[in-house]
UniProtKB/Swiss-Prot annotation:
Gene Ontology molecular function: any one: transmembrane transporter activity
UniProt-annotated stretches for the region Disordered: 62-82, 117-147
Keywords: Cell membrane, Membrane, Transmembrane, Transmembrane helix, Transport
Name the UniProt record assigns to this protein: Uncharacterized ABC transporter permease YclI
Ranges in coiled-coil conformation: none
Entry GO CC: plasma membrane
Start-end of Low complexity biased regions: 119-132
Amino acid sequence: MNFIKRAFWNMKAKKGKTLLQLFVFTVICVFVLSGLAIQSAAQKSSELARQELGGSVTLQVDRQKQMEKQQDSGEKRSFESTPIKVSDANKLAALDHVKSYNYTTSASANAGNFDAIESSSSSDSSSSSSSSNAKNSQGGGQGGPQMVQADLSIEGVISTALVDDFSDGDSKITDGRAITKSDVGKKVTVINETLAEENDLSVGDSITIESATDEDTTVKLKIVGIYKTTSSGDDQAQNFSFLNPYNKLYTPYTATAALKGDDYKNTIDSAVYYMDDAKNMDTFVKAAKKTSIDFDTYTLNTNDQLYQQMVGPIENVASFSKNVVYLVSVAGAVILGLIVMMSIRERKYEMGVLMAIGEKRWKLIGQFLTEILIVAVIAIGLASVTGNLVANQLGNQLLSQQISSSTDSTQTASGQMPGGGGGMGGKMFGHSSSNVDVIDSLNVAVSMNDMLILGGIGILIAIIATLLPSISVLRLHPKTILTKQE
C-alpha cells in the first residue's frame, strides 16, 4: 500500500477534518487571490493614467537664486525681468520624452479701438484715476512689474489647447478657432465672448492694443477665435480691469513679446514641457542639465500633480492589498499548521505502527503532504471561481474609502490656505489640478499570472503547514510512540 492511497483513504474516512481544512484553505486562497488581483488592477490603472496624463516640467527664472545673489552682493531685493531665449527653450523641446510643449509670455495692455470690460471699483473711480497717473498695479505678469493701470491681460502662447483653462474645460472656443503653433509670428488673437459682445466684435475683425508701459507701442491683432470662460478670476478683479477674466486675450507668444518691446524679441517668460510618461520626468531633467542653458539663472520645476491626484487613492489600495497578501499568507500558514499538528498528534499510533513495520519516515511525511496538497488544489479551484467577485467588491469598497479619506484631507488642507493659494499664479505654469477626477473604480479581473502566484503561495503554505508539525513527531522512535499510546 503506497502513501498516496493512504492519503485518499484517510481523507475519506475523516471527512469532517478534511472539510475544515478545505474551508480554511479556501478562505486563505480567496483573500490572497483578491489581494493579488487588486494589485494587478491598480498597477494597470496607474500605468494607463500615467501614460495618459504624463507630467510637465517648467523652465523658468529661478527667483530664489536671483534674490540670494542680490542679498550676497548687498543690493536691495527687487524683481528683475529675466526672459528666456526661445533658442534655449527649443533645445529642451528637442529632447526625448517631450510629447508637447508650450511657451508662455504675459503682459498687460490698454484697449485701443475698443473698450475693455470695466470692473466695479475701476468704473467708480475712473474720473479720479484719469487725473492721476499714479495707478499702482503690477500688470506685467512674468514680464516684470508695471506701475500703471492696465485694461487687458495678454497671454502669449504656442497653443491655447495646452493652456490649463482650456485643457481643464474652464474655457472653450465658441466661434472661430484656437491659437496653434502655425500662428507663431502672426498678429492674431482669441478674445473673450463677453468682450466681443460688448464691442460688437466678431471673428475676422481687427483690434488694436497699446502697451501699458509705452503708449507708442501698439499691436494690431486680427480676431481668429472667441472663447467662453467659467472662471471667476482673481478676487482683485473687481479692483483691476486687467484681472477681469473677460479682459483676457490670447495671442501667439511672438505677438505678446512685440507688445513688450524690442528687448523681449525672441524671448518668453516660461516654457512648459509635457512628458509622454510621468516616470520620464527625471530622465528629461537630467538630459536638460547637460545642455548649455544657464541653470544658475533658470530652473526646472517638475510637476506630476495631476497624476498623483488621480492615482493617489488607488496606490493606497494597492499598498493595502499587498499587506493583506502578506498577512493572510502568514496567518494562513500558522492556522493550517495548527490544524495539521492536531491531526498528526491524533495519528501518533498510526505512525508508530507504520514505522514499526518498516515504513520510511519520508513516506509518512509524503502522505500528510499529499492530503494537504489535495485540499490546496481544490481550494485554489474554488478561489478562482469566487475570487473575482470578492476582489471586485473588496477593491472598489477600499477605493471608495480611500477617495473619501483623501477628499476630507484635501478639504482640510485647503481650509488652512486662505484664498486657495491665490489668483493667477496657480494656473500659470501647468500646475492646475482642480478639475482632475480621481480613479473611482477598479476593473478587477483574475489573470493567469495571479493564479500562478496563488498556486505558488498555496503550495508553499501547504508545505510549511505540513513539514513543521511533522518534524516534531517523526523524530520520535516507533517504540516510544507505541509505549506512550498504551
